[in-house]
Amino acid sequence: MEAAAQFFVESPDVVYGPEAIEAQYEYRTTRVSREGGVLKVHPTSTRFTFRTARQVPRLGVMLVGWGGNNGSTLTAAVLANRLRLSWPTRSGRKEANYYGSLTQAGTVSLGLDAEGQEVFVPFSAVLPMVAPNDLVFDGWDISSLNLAEAMRRAKVLDWGLQEQLWPHMEALRPRPSVYIPEFIAANQSARADNLIPGSRAQQLEQIRRDIRDFRSSAGLDKVIVLWTANTERFCEVIPGLNDTAENLLRTIELGLEVSPSTLFAVASILEGCAFLNGSPQNTLVPGALELAWQHRVFVGGDDFKSGQTKVKSVLVDFLIGSGLKTMSIVSYNHLGNNDGENLSAPLQFRSKEVSKSNVVDDMVQSNPVLYTPGEEPDHCVVIKYVPYVGDSKRALDEYTSELMLGGTNTLVLHNTCEDSLLAAPIMLDLALLTELCQRVSFCTDMDPEPQTFHPVLSLLSFLFKAPLVPPGSPVVNALFRQRSCIENILRACVGLPPQNHMLLEHKMERPGPSLKRVGPVAATYPMLNKKGPVPAATNGCTGDANGHLQEEPPMPTT
């Protein structure tokens, strides 16, 4: 990958110090009140001071389910990029990259240059971020296969790439993990040969020792723990069992019901390590969230948003945003990897069904013109296990919407999702953005005491199907709103205004001095090319509309 373009914000509100970037930022929003059936909108403004530490740490990532398809693929991706590997395929030679990663392959607009063109820089250039090639991996798995064998079992990567990676992955072996049969499908028992023995309390202590050992032996400044193991069944929230931090810790000590993922979450929090849940079950029960609050440790979840659901969070936003009343959404999937085999059990499927079904809720609620209170589209989700297709998941969707005057519109979409190749860059982004958030603090004029983000890191919602948010906060599922949130918070950290896409300087008849139009100004009524049709572009497009040549209009007679 090319080095990220450097930039500096020249403003009296931004100071680049040796240790931190400090930026003054005016946060403008609105508050709405209701008086006698009338909505009154009150613009508000809050002055923030953001401080972002510039020193990038040595970061370790521990994956629960390291030997699964996602874990082995992410490890292989980082190694392939670090080693600058390339390999032949039937369509030509491929080179390692980080396509699919928001931080590594996404860009941010800085503004307009002297010619009126937008200038874009890589997402990773906005603030100092850990370089993905510098990440150090470790983790746990109930299967004892080393990472090279796990990579081969997954059947995700081309054979030529696997052969080059084999000697680098063969020495990587997962630590023993926690196996509680009633939480995952019975068909997973054949893999379970690498287990932490003992009581729940003993297992918790062993996980904590593993985290400390990894941090110490690898010389790390920080560790982030990420659950990418099997989907578990939901764990019932019961007062006295897992509703408070104290009760949850007592439950573990007494050996009562607690899921493996919650054990890992508790261990991570107690060790001061951020924990991210990439599966749909309710790992972060109220007691775990309270524990994270007490220890001021970031947690995030739930369920990686990678393929079908990511498309859904765009398409439904488009339909409802266009004024179409979506009334039926039917989503069918079949896949053949281990995730699909585990989801073939009813209780595990139910966890996934819930996370995939709730993704349209906020978009429906945003339009009371279309939907009356309590009204929502019919939404059906089906997942089937078909071993032959492996990691290449097929997703078929049908969206039916009502049009004006009784009409209907139906969209049918087929999406072939390379499951782990879509999930791996999301896991990468989760680790890098979480670590970055750990270096950001801020205060306001009204509250000058520095603080950090809420322990429930809702900024990560772009990357999750069922995003966790702080109590009382709105849940946002619309993809572009989620991306804008991340982009605009990073912009605020360097004193830049939010990206509003207005481009007013290009829409005014007479832009004022502060909105001076830059670049060449087109004639009020531009003439077409007098030499005939627009020449063909290099991509084969001529620019002709529906096959009609662009001809010179007749000159007005005098």
UniProtKB/Swiss-Prot annotation:
The modification Phosphoserine is found at S279, S357. NAD(+) binds at residues 67-70, 141, 177-178, 188, 191, 228-231, 278-279, 303, 306, 337-339, 352, 390-391, 419-420. Keywords: Cytoplasm, Inositol biosynthesis, Isomerase, Lipid biosynthesis, Lipid metabolism, NAD, Phospholipid biosynthesis, Phospholipid metabolism, Phosphoprotein. Its EC number is 5.5.1.4. InterPro entries: Myo-inos-1-P_Synthase (IPR002587), Myo-inos-1-P_Synthase_GAPDH (IPR013021), NAD(P)-bd_dom_sf (IPR036291). SUPFAM superfamilies: Glyceraldehyde-3-phosphate dehydrogenase-like, C-terminal domain, NAD(P)-binding Rossmann-fold domains. Induction: By glucose and lovastain. Up-regulation is prevented by mevalonic acid, farnesol, and geranylgeraniol. Up-regulated by E2F1. Pathway: Polyol metabolism; myo-inositol biosynthesis; myo-inositol from D-glucose 6-phosphate: step 1/2. Its cofactor is NAD(+). Residues 537-558 are annotated as: Disordered. Optimum pH is 8.0. GO terms for biological process: inositol biosynthetic process; phospholipid biosynthetic process. It holds the Pfam family NAD_binding_5. Phosphorylation at Ser-279 and Ser-357 may be associated with a decrease in activity. It catalyses: D-glucose 6-phosphate = 1D-myo-inositol 3-phosphate. It is found in: Cytoplasm. The keyword Cytoplasm applies. Highly expressed in testis, ovary, heart, placenta and pancreas. Weakly expressed in blood leukocyte, thymus, skeletal muscle and colon. Inhibited by mood-stabilizing drugs such as valproate (VPA) and lithium. Changing S177 to A/D: Decreases activity. GO terms for molecular function: inositol-3-phosphate synthase activity. GO terms for cellular component: cytoplasm; cytosol. Key enzyme in myo-inositol biosynthesis pathway that catalyzes the conversion of glucose 6-phosphate to 1-myo-inositol 1-phosphate in a NAD-dependent manner. Rate-limiting enzyme in the synthesis of all inositol-containing compounds. Belongs to the myo-inositol 1-phosphate synthase family. This is Inositol-3-phosphate synthase 1. It comes from Homo sapiens (Human).
